[in-house]
Amino acid sequence: AQSAKQVISLRVKEAEKNRQYEDFIEKQGQILSGIIKRLEYGNVIVDLGKAEGVIKKDELIPREILKTGDRVKAYCYEVKKELKGHQIFLSRAHPQFLAKLFFQEVPEIYEGTIEIKAVARDPGSRAKICVHSQDSSIDPVGACVGMRGSRVQTIVNELHGEKIDIIKWTEDLPTLISESLSPAEIQRVLIDQDNKRIDIILTEEN
């Protein structure tokens, strides 16, 4: 009887682990929020309620200070199933963390009126995001910035002061490259389609 109870108990635990895995695999690619439980060798362990997530040291924003008990947001980039359970990997440095923050703060992006075309980040320093509006009457850059900068400022605060350049997407590649590399002054953009190479010539001051 004792052996049967142990088998049932193990199966219940296994079923619970599988259910938790299924719950979190659906959240992969989303922003999760939790309380910092502890710090281990520079990694941050986050209590997500029914499970723990880990933000590895190299997935943190450089120079940000996180403490036990703080509430933290992070992007769930991988849920890995293992024999002892599952691991939930989180990131605050991932480019998609920035993209998903814009999804949360800008209704036009959430609704699909504005599309995020590209994202690049130097975490903690500068980020660039290219946006395109499906509706010609809506300025994608203005919508992302918000009234008096309210929308983008919320994201900047979450990223501890990371400067965010919002760029209007264009099919004209030289123009897009020039806008993306601002504030550097571009003299010329040379595109070699055959060799898939782009040469950028800056003005002498740069």
Could you describe each region identified by the protein language model?
Residues 1-206:
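RNA-contacting regions in translation and RNA-metabolism proteins
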